[in-house]
Every structure is written in C-alpha cells, then in structure tokens.
From Swiss-Prot:
NCBIfam families: PRK09293.1-3, PRK09293.1-4. It holds the Pfam family FBPase_C. Keywords: Carbohydrate metabolism, Cytoplasm, Hydrolase, Magnesium, Metal-binding. Its EC number is 3.1.3.11. It catalyses: beta-D-fructose 1,6-bisphosphate + H2O = beta-D-fructose 6-phosphate + phosphate. Its cofactor is Mg(2+). GO terms for molecular function: fructose 1,6-bisphosphate 1-phosphatase activity; magnesium ion binding. It comes from Acinetobacter baumannii (strain ATCC 17978 / DSM 105126 / CIP 53.77 / LMG 1025 / NCDC KC755 / 5377). This is Fructose-1,6-bisphosphatase class 1.
Length: 323
C-alpha cells in the first residue's frame, strides 16, 4: 500500500481543517522544499556564512536565514487565505491578503548556527485564525490554545515534516525523487517516562534553584532519588531536540535564568514555544514555563520570550513541582 501524500492526508482530515487551511499548509510545505534545496546547495551556491547584519532579536543573521525568510514571505503574502504573517526575523508583521482567513507565524530557519557545520536545522510554523478583514498587529495576540495548526520541517539526513491540526501528530518524509511529502507515521506518541534530557549545561550557574535541583538529580542518576541513569543530548536546534522527543521521548529545557533577568527566557513564544507545545501536547506530552502551561499564555508582544520545559509528561510534571 502506497503512502498518502501530504495533500491526500489533509483532504481526509476533519475538525479544524478546512480546505482553505489545507491550502495554506500545502504552500508552507512547498516552500520548505525550496528551502531544503537551498540548504542542499550550501557552499556550492555561496550561501553559507553570515549575512552581515542582525535580526530584530539582536542575533547575527546567516545568509540562509535571510533566504529562507524571503521564500516564506514571498509565498505566503500573496496566498488568498493568509491575512497576515509574522517572522522571527522581522520586527513587524507583514500584511497579506484582505479577508484572508489565517495568520501564519514562523521561524524560517531554527538552529541556523548549525548551518556552517552541516548539522540539522529546521523551519517552525504556527497558524492562527484571522480576526479582521484587514489584519492588525493585535490580531496576532492569541494564546497558543487558539492555534488551528502547527508543525516543523526538519532538514536532516532525510527531510521530514511533523504536523498537527488538532487531531494528533503525523510525520511526513520528503521523497527526494518525486519531491513529495509522504505520510510515514500517524498518531505519534511521546512516552510518559524517559531517561534522556536536553539542556545547555553551560548556563548552569545562571539557573534558578528548582532547575538546578532537577538537573543535579538527573546527573547523579542511580545514586540519587531517581534511582536510574540519564543521558544528556543537545542539538542546538529546537527542531532537532523536539523531533527526538517525539520519536523516543525525553525532556527539553530552556529555562528562565538570571544571566539577563530582564528577559523572561530565550525562546520566542509565538514562533517556537507555542507551535512546539501544540505538537508535544497533541502527542501526549506536556509543556510549561515551569510555572504555567505555555499554551495558555496570553501574549503581549510579537517577539515575547518565555522559558520552555517540554516533553515526556512525567518528567515535565516533576520539574514543575519543584518550582
């Protein structure tokens, strides 16, 4: 039996998935194929390295950050069902089509520091319902519970898409010969327990005490109250770390720290935390800042940052109980 294509899968889905939403998702997938092709060329096309400027986050942009962002902006701003879009790379939102039913938010190339060393990167996207015929900035200020779809594309040894439209999580793999996303896993589930964790341990001295306590217990392994050993993984690309969790369980932490107390966290609520939280929760996992469920946060600004603790439910609940 042949695998369903992404388009065929979307035609069969029900619930929140309207034909218009399916078209938006198809366009995102098609654009990610173009990004994938650019990444494959890399040094051959002279597009590795820095673009020589910073984005709104104060981060140095890679050339492929800019290229990927442009591809998505160009494809979505003319889409008849997209009222507006927002990118992690741009200060303000981009107005799209009048009466477009959906708003699209995205991180065009997550983990771009990995580009020049040929490690995994990804595209993350979130889709919200539009609020007005002509999109306004305030229309994007919706809690993650309002998302109608979320997903990512992982550019790795094989190019894969993880997608939820509010009815579980499915994986699609890009066939390099036909350039078609094919359904390869349905009903993805995150195991409730795990022995893997992902955190940037170089920030340990800046963590709050609850996170310090939790990680110290994991590192102590069998000699601690946990009575089992844990392995640490860190890809420096949220897409890569979350994909691993969806495949075999685990917990990912980018907690609040005291290095810059004015910043609530490192990761962006709208472009990273919300879509990844929807995916993880739809697969049976959990997602929190350590104090509140991420999907229930009412955003106050487009580039709002939050702490993120996400993954296997029992581990997320345990570290939350320490706060």
């Amino acid at each position: 039996m042949s695998n369903l294509t992404l388009s065929q899968f979307l035609q069969q889905e029900k619930g929140n998935l309207t034909p218009e939403l399916a078209q938006v998702i198809d366009t995102i997938a098609a654009t990610c194929k173009t990004i994938d092709q650019a990444l494959q060329k890399g040094a051959l096309a002279g597009i590795l390295g820095s673009a020589g400027n910073e984005n709104v986050q104060g981060e140095t942009q890679k050339k492929l950050d800019v290229i990927s962002n442009d591809y998505l902006i160009d494809a979505l701003k003319v889409h008849p069902h997209v009222g507006g879009l927002a990118s992690e790379e741009l200060d303000d939102f981009t107005l799209a089509q009048e009466n477009g039913e959906y708003l699209v938010l995205f991180d065009p190339l997550d983990g771009s520091s990995n580009i020049d060393i040929n490690m995994c990167v990804g595209t993350i996207f979130s889709i919200l319902p539009a609020k007005n015929a002509v999109t306004q900035a305030q229309d994007f200020m919706q809690a993650g519970t309002q998302q109608v779809a979320a997903g990512y594309v992982l550019y790795g040894p094989s190019t894969m898409m993880a997608l939820t439209v509010g009815n579980g999580v499915a994986f699609f793999t890009l066939d390099p010969e036909t350039q078609t996303f094919l359904l390869t896993t349905e009903n993805v589930q995150v195991s409730a327990d795990t022995q893997e964790f992902a955190i940037n341990a170089s920030n340990q001295r800046h963590w709050e005490q609850p996170v310090k306590q939790y990680i110290e217990e994991l590192l102590a392994g069998k000699t601690s109250v946990r009575e089992k050993d844990f392995n640490m993984r860190w890809v420096a690309c949220m897409v890569g770390d979350v994909h691993r969790i969806l495949c075999r369980g685990g917990i990912f932490l980018y907690p609040y720290d005291l290095k810059d107390p004015k910043k609530a966290g490192r990761l962006r609520l709208m472009y990273e935390a919300n879509p990844m939280s929807m995916l993880i929760e739809q697969a049976g996992g959990a997602s929190t800042t350590g104090r509140v469920r991420i999907l229930e946060i009412e955003p106050t600004e487009l580039h709002q940052r939050v702490p993120v603790i996400i993954g296997s439910k029992n581990e997320v609940e345990r570290v939350t109980s320490y706060h």
